[in-house]
Amino acid sequence: MVSHPFHDETVDWMGHRAFLPLPCLARTVPSQTWLEARILEGCTPIFNQDKEEQKMAEIAVEATEVPAQLPHLRVAVLGAGKMGGILLQAFLKQNLFAPEQIHATVGHAERAIALSTQWGVDVSTDNLRAAKHADLILLGVKPFQVPDLIAEIKPALTTKKTLISFAASVKTRAIEDAAGMEIAVIRAMPNTPSALGAGAAGLCKGRFVSAKQMELAQRIFETVGRTVVVDEKHMDAVTGLSASGPAYIYIIIEALAEAGVKVGLPRDTATQLAAQTTFGAAKMVLETGYHPALLKDAVTTPAGCTIDGILELEEGGLRVTLIKAVMRATQRAKELAAG
């Protein structure tokens, strides 16, 4: 069905709304999926579900063949949805934990069966049972669900367990108070590139966290990317910058690709160049340690092409717009924390 003059709206395999530029639409029956349409028209699919499921099955097999790095810990992932699932898969891929060390939970029995088969770990709908047998409990539910989850698993909590929450804007003190004991609570804010081991995560500790527990949390999140430890007062800023940040960068990549199309490049070529350029620039910053301004100046020759492009960016307000985006997202995180 066409609901926009320039896009076809459909639903992808995850149930998300997807908009497909008309040049990539298949010219056959309306019942074709978004992915099928792209394949039939010669466009490269963004995601292949079958290959991803096969990959996870292979990871599960590999995890049983290589000794786990932390074999002494039992782990519960309560709410193995988007981010919880990303972390769980990273644990297996990096052999941080063996499948038999992990018990994940989801909201529906049918999904539990499917994910147990896919991941090779114990998956159920029983949060209390998972928490009871775990040393390390990851809280992967949405912020508004945290109080009910803590109440549900409270009979299984002891001061020897460690809780790691990545529910946005939920403070460590709130979880400590809900637990009703001096339990270690660590707050984490990862982002979606963690799925490829290229994430960025901010961590902060509650009042009862030992140095050893914090080191464990850092080790866990370093399996999915870079990790920084901050004071809790800065966690909303982490949310506004790195947790929301991938969306900002996707817009930049999309805009660069559109620009490439505008000046004559095929769309797939333009997208690859835009994405790789963004990746390469980020890698230069991280691996050289140079300030971005110095790296920018190294590309900008007198009276050259780049300085003209930069002039357009500055006149268009890109720098200020990005700053305002992070400020607004940070403010929204604070609003959510305040209820």
Q: Which residues make up each language-model segment?
A:
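NAD(P)-dependent Rossmann-like dehydrogenase/reductase catalytic/cofactor-binding core
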Residues: 57-69, 275-339
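Rossmann-like NAD(P)(H) cofactor-binding subdomain of soluble oxidoreductases
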Residues: 87, 103, 108-110, 119, ...
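Internal alpha-helical scaffold of NAD(P)-dependent oxidoreductase catalytic cores
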Residues: 59, 174-184, 200-238, 250-287, ...
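Intrinsic disorder/low-complexity segments
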Residues: 1-56
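Small-residue helix-packing motif on alpha-helices
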Residues: 102, 112, 130, 266-273, ...
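NAD(P)+-binding Rossmann beta1-loop-alpha1 motif at the extreme N-terminus of oxidoreductases
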Residues: 47, 52-125, 129-133, 198-199, ...
